[in-house]
Curated annotation (Swiss-Prot):
It catalyses: (2E)-4-hydroxy-3-methylbut-2-enyl diphosphate + oxidized [flavodoxin] + H2O + 2 H(+) = 2-C-methyl-D-erythritol 2,4-cyclic diphosphate + reduced [flavodoxin]. It is an enzyme of class 1 (oxidoreductase). [4Fe-4S] cluster binds at residues 270, 273, 305, 312. Its EC number is 1.17.7.3. InterPro entries: Dihydropteroate_synth-like_sf, IspG_bac, IspG_bac-typ, NO2/SO3_Rdtase_4Fe4S_sf. Transmembrane segments: none annotated. One of its GO terms (molecular function) is 4-hydroxy-3-methylbut-2-en-1-yl diphosphate synthase activity (ferredoxin). This is 4-hydroxy-3-methylbut-2-en-1-yl diphosphate synthase (flavodoxin). Converts 2C-methyl-D-erythritol 2,4-cyclodiphosphate (ME-2,4cPP) into 1-hydroxy-2-methyl-2-(E)-butenyl 4-diphosphate. It comes from Shigella flexneri. One of its GO terms (biological process) is terpenoid biosynthetic process.
Length: 375
């Protein structure tokens, strides 16, 4: 019920990764990367399916060897989400996964081989309508740029990116997106700002090697949040030394916080104090776990007392305001019922699921009505 943020997205060209539109106003895609051995087909497929279940739009898979390329073929046959093959050094691997239906190639033209090998990869991508992601990373800058700048700088990352962009321009290939990642927030943010002024291709955002689940989420939220609030970014990955599923969850949380894209429940909860009338923290933790399957966008406020509870409930899809023994339940800003504090979790879960079903049905009817008008 909150207003959408007035963020003006940077204009960019449109590409497709599989069936997912990227750029030109398309929803910002959230992606992750598998951390299994790609040659372990079963483990990799299971991880990709877990990522699909939490909403991953795109999944990247490292393909370092020809054996991994053969495994990629089997993996691709068993999943639905578009797959990006992460390839370095050996152009033949890129050609092989292209045969196997890869949806996007992540390469650096600078380390894939000489001009002829780059041309072979680009020609193959063009023939099969496969986009490319140019991935520049502060930790693997070209030696001459390291010597020129002394250390990774925004200008160094920009020069590296433009060098690779020029490779593709010379080959008349424009179906690509670009990333300029760094583990330092300020370095990454300024690099993306510079790049956004130079090209109109889609940008893939990330703070690389951000850290563990907690620290990495914080760094990513700050860095990606700054860029997204300025309208920069068309896809994103939150890089965590953690279960890749957490990367997708944090990615959507960042987008939800900026009111850019919503998926599932946005919980609004107080940090609690001695005024709370029920166990707010336990309630929120339990509901977050129980309701992970809900993809309907909705705001749910869970506030332990009447100080801020009614105000938050006014702008929430559903809201609970703590009261003595029973707490007020609000729906779309209107007080509807009272819930027993001793059975709060089960009651609220049932109400949320019912509301989600109601909203889904309303959207289904709206879509049907629009279809009738069009036809």
């Amino acid at each position: 019920m909150h207003n959408q943020a007035p963020i003006q997205r940077r204009k960019s060209t449109r590409i497709y990764v599989g069936n997912v539109p990227i750029g030109d106003g398309a929803p910002i895609a959230v992606q992750s990367m598998t951390n299994t051995r790609t040659t372990d087909v079963e483990a990799t497929v299971n991880q990709i399916k877990a990522l699909e279940r939490v909403g991953a739009d795109i999944v990247r898979v490292s393909v370092p060897t020809m054996d991994a390329a053969e495994a990629f073929k089997l993996i691709k046959q068993r999943v639905n989400v578009p797959l990006v093959a992460d390839i370095h050094f050996d152009y033949r691997i890129a050609l092989k996964v292209a045969e196997y239906g890869v949806d996007c190639l992540r390469i650096n033209p600078g380390n894939i081989g000489n001009e002829e090998r780059i041309r072979m990869v680009v020609d193959c991508a063009r023939d099969k309508n496969i986009p490319i992601r140019i991935g520049v990373n502060a930790g693997s800058l070209e030696k001459d740029l390291q010597e020129k700048y002394g250390e990774p700088t925004p200008q160094a990352l920009l020069e590296s990116a433009m060098r690779h962009v020029d490779h593709l321009d010379r080959l008349n290939f424009d179906q690509f997106k670009v990333s300029v990642k760094a583990s330092d927030v300020f370095l990454a943010v300024e690099s993306y700002r510079l790049l956004a002024k130079q090209i109109d291709q889609p940008l893939h955002l990330g703070i690389t090697e951000a850290g563990g689940a907690r620290s990495g989420a914080v760094k990513s939220a700050i860095g990606l949040g700054l860029l997204l609030s300025e309208g920069i970014g068309d896809t994103l990955r939150v890089s965590l030394a953690a279960d890749p599923v957490e990367e997708i969850k944090v990615g959507f949380d960042i987008l939800k916080s900026l009111r850019i894209r919503s998926r599932g429940i946005n919980f609004i909860a107080c940090p609690t104090c001695s005024r709370q009338e029920f166990d707010v923290i336990g309630t929120v933790n339990a509901l977050e776990q129980r309701l992970e399957d809900i993809i309907t966008p909705m705001d749910v406020s869970i506030i332990g007392c009447v100080v801020n509870g009614p105000g938050e409930a006014l702008v929430s899809t559903l809201g609970v305001t703590g009261g003595n023994k029973k707490s007020g339940l609000y729906e779309d800003g209107v007080r509807k019922d009272r819930l027993d504090n001793n059975d709060m979790i089960d009651q609220l879960e049932a109400r949320i699921r019912a509301k989600a079903s109601q909203l889904d049905e309303a959207r289904r009817i709206d879509v049907q009505q629009v279809g009738k008008i069009i036809t």
